[in-house]
Amino acid sequence: MQGILAEIELDFPPLQIQEKIATILDTFTELSAELRERKKQYAFYRDYLLNQENIRKIYGANIPFETFQVKDICEIRRGRAITKAYIRNNPGENPVYSAATTNDGELGRIKDCDFDGEYITWTTNGYAGVVFYRNGKFNASQDCGVLKVKNKKICTKFLSFLLKIEAPKFVHNLASRPKLSQKVMAEIELSFPPLEIQEKIADILFAFEKLCNDLVEGIPAEIEMRKKQLDYYYHLIFSKIAHFSKQLA
């Protein structure tokens, strides 16, 4: 094996470029590791603060909990068919949320407004079971379910955090296309502390989530910048190789 490796011939760009490429690749590794660590850290604290036993440790051993199914505390709806062509032909300010999970689930923006206020959406197909908290004017595609809290004992933000943990557990993998239907969502059972405690926990998690998202959003931007730097050096190397090849021809 050592003999084979010894015979391998490698071409190297100038040392300065080697060092720059190595530095960029090291940065990729570090940024990717930090991205994973931030997401793990957030998930750990979210799960800890939403655990019933931990809530009692923090707020008192005698804190009561009430258990409800989603259908008992929410109006459950589904979005409508909104095509990309419709979005192109009806541009506006109101987002259309779909089964996408990138860009906050936003497919585009139109003039229409099907929902206005505090809601929860979830993806019903594809990347099913991904939950988002919404507050404002928006629309939802047919691959997006919509919840509106109707019980005054429930904090919408708190419910959204609970569902981010629980909803993925109820996703059905049918013919390699995961689904979380309205019917299944309606039957999910959740336990809630008093409203005042829900609001305190939701405020903590919302602030922490925003902080983590701000940090996480900055990391891909840094990675993209490093990719552009790497592309620059690759182009520089290959243009020189092409130049030398022409001279040798």
UniProtKB/Swiss-Prot annotation:
Keywords in alphabetical order: DNA-binding, Restriction system
GO MF annotations in UniProt: DNA binding
SUPFAM superfamilies in the cross-refs: DNA methylase specificity domain
DNA-binding in keyword set: yes
Keyword DNA-binding: yes
InterPro entries per UniProt: Restrct_endonuc_typeI_TRD (IPR000055), Restrct_endonuc_typeI_TRD_sf (IPR044946), Type-I_RE_S_subunit (IPR051212)
Family annotation (Pfam families): Methylase_S
Biological process terms in GO annotation: DNA restriction-modification system
Expression triggers: Detected at low levels after 6 and 96 hours growth, there are fewer copies at 96 hours (at protein level).
Transmembrane regions: none
Similarity comment: Belongs to the type-I restriction system S methylase family.
Subunit note: The methyltransferase is composed of M and S polypeptides.
Domain notes for this protein: Contains two DNA recognition domains, each specifying recognition of one of the two defined components of the target sequence.
Stated role: The specificity (S) subunit of a type I methyltransferase (MTase); this subunit dictates DNA sequence specificity. The single R subunit has multiple frameshifts and is probably not expressed.
Name the record gives this protein: Putative type I specificity subunit S.MpnORF615P
